[in-house]
């Protein structure tokens, strides 16, 4: 079998945590989680498009999140609301082409967009407006990287829950 270029122990652990949260008996790759609430196989493009379309048509996420580069810092601001959530920074490669050695895509070159290469909790949100500043060079080290900031509830089991706010900053790498 071909090894997934973007796999990591952390990603696998997160997939199993989502399986617990979403009461799913399956973990597979590639797997997409939409807004922390819906699990979809990338092998089901029609279903994926429907889930994304439905999520896009739903009311906006309830908590405003803004992220911007200011000088050498990434500055994140959230609005207020109710409950608690983790503030998570997701680092991604905006575009990466990989030659697949084996498997159903063996011999092909596939281009991935926005493949997450790192996740880190950067704060705890307690329902009040929050500002977090991070040194850009500590998190965004390579050209072609971007980041997303997710405000994500945690379930009673301690697993990832619903995303209640989000922001994206593209083209942020060195």
Predicted regions mapped to residue ranges:
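Short, conserved sequence motifs used for protein processing/export or organelle targeting and
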Residues: 2-29, 37-174
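Ligand-binding face of N-terminal immunoglobulin V-set domains in extracellular IgSF glycoproteins
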Residues: 32
């Amino acid at each position: 079998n071909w090894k997934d270029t973007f796999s990591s122990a952390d990603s696998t652990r997160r997939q199993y945590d989502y399986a617990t949260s979403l009461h799913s008996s399956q973990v597979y790759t590639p797997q997409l989680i939409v807004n922390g609430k819906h699990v979809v196989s990338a092998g089901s493009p029609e279903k994926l498009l429907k889930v994304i379309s439905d999520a896009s048509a739903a009311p906006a996420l309830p908590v405003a999140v803004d992220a911007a580069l200011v000088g050498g810092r990434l500055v994140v601001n959230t609005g207020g609301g109710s409950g608690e959530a983790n503030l998570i920074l997701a680092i991604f490669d905006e575009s990466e082409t990989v030659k697949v050695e084996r498997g159903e895509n063996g011999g092909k070159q596939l281009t991935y967009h926005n493949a997450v290469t790192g996740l880190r909790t950067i704060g705890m949100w307690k329902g009040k407006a929050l500002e977090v500043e991070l040194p850009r060079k500590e998190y965004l080290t390579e050209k072609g990287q971007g980041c997303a900031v997710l405000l994500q509830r945690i379930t009673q089991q301690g697993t990832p829950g619903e995303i209640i706010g989000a922001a994206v900053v593209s083209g942020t790498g060195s």
